[in-house]
Amino acid sequence: FRSGMKIETIHAFCERLLRLFPVEAGISPGFTIMSEQMARAELERALRFVARRHRSGAVARALAAVARATDEETCLDLLARIHGARTALALFLGGDGASKLPPILHPLLRLPEGLTATRVRQGLAFDVDAYSGLAETLRRGPKTDRERAGHIDRQAHGGATLIELSTLFLTTEGKPRTANGLISKSLARDEPWALELLLADQERLIRGLAALADLDHVGATVELMSLAAAVVKEVADRKQRANLLDFEDLIIHVNRLLSARPEAAWVLYKL
């Protein structure tokens, strides 16, 4: 006690208030508060039900995309975080849901509005004639240069992009090659234009791959939120049938009880 008042957590206060005024809050008396373990288990059951129910369509595509991007445990962790923040997310996204995310995320990632993976790949096209000339030049160099020329010969065709030539510019770990890793010193000295071309296109490739990765993240986020919408709805239906409330529900119902519902004035008077 402090100054005669009992100090309670916000959730304990909300639970006590809802047990005093369940009908006024629009909930059934005798509700059960879910522990974190119960909430996690309910979320997992809801996810499995959604997966069984949606064998095709948008939700199925979202589930497949999320499954490709992460494992089941991480997926459940992400869904739990989204479910816990569902009220704030609903206020933020409004009725648009996941479709509202790309215009929000693109500026945060410094992606131009409306940018697509197709446009990025188109921007990574290269001049086939220029690279044919580069291959001829590389064939005059040592063994490593001749191997680079062979790689260009195999990939330099109509429709190819710098992505197909990525091993010229990047190591197996995906790191940029140094100038000496792009072309031999002797050939770079004799043919400086060749090194300039390789360095310029290396930078162009790095920027393009970064943009594609960011677009993948945006797409994965949209798919995750689409899946989460179906899972959150299923969890809500299950909780309603079993008369269960989680911690977020306590705050939601008390907020409505004290502000939005017609009985608010009477409840405040009784308090």
Located regions from the model:
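Conserved P-loop NTPase-based nucleic-acid remodeling module centered on helicase motor cores
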Residues: 1-64, 100-104, 113
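Conserved helicase NTPase motor core
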Residues: 6-15, 31-44, 200-271
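Accessory nucleic-acid engagement/destabilization modules that flank
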Residues: 12, 45-75, 87, 126-133, ...
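Conserved NTP-handling cores and scaffolds of large molecular machines
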Residues: 14, 21-25, 47-58, 70, ...
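Generic alpha-helix signal with a bias toward terminal, lower-confidence helices
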Residues: 17-33, 43-46, 62-63, 75-78, ...
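Charge-rich, acidic-biased intrinsically disordered regions
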Residues: 67-74, 147, 154, 247-257
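Conserved ATP-driven helicase/translocase motor core recognized via long
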Residues: 75-245
